[in-house]
């Protein structure tokens, strides 16, 4: 005997709504309608309930311990990278205690006002407004930009896009050719002239 017309999976005779109503985990049974609502049923519902933390104290404690484990794992990876880098560069191996103490020293020294002032002073460039310094700065910038873009040739007006050697060789070639042509014209018998 096949399934009844009321359902395709069968078991309709055994199904009781009362059992579902009394079940503590009825959301698991009606998962599609309650936990993954769609359309107008999704209005006002938190559709990302699954990505949020749990509310029981044991679940919160386990999440916190997982976060601590993750932090420790990342710290171990960084220390391992430091050791491998020191080994590759031929430096002495840093100990774990030295790594943690150097991190603490770095944190305390970067927060001091004196260090921040000295860093700011060392990074700031002196911009004197005297004409000599201004001229020197402009010359330096000009040579830097000329060197960068190959525009140092622009300052010599006799140069073309051709190299000096090529330009001279072609100029000499053309002038010699023109001279030969002129000489031939002068000595040719078909002048029709004298």
Curated annotation (Swiss-Prot):
InterPro entries documented for this protein: MMTA2_N (IPR019315), MMTAG2-like (IPR039207)
Biased composition (Polar residues): 53-63, 98-111, 119-132
Pfam family, one: MMtag
Residue ranges, compositional bias (Basic and acidic residues): 175-194
Chain positions covered by the region annotation Disordered: 52-71, 86-194
GO CC entries: nucleus
Biased composition (Basic residues): 133-169
PANTHER family to which the protein is assigned, alphabetical: MULTIPLE MYELOMA TUMOR-ASSOCIATED PROTEIN 2, MULTIPLE MYELOMA TUMOR-ASSOCIATED PROTEIN 2 FAMILY MEMBER
Name of the protein in question: Uncharacterized protein C6G10.10c
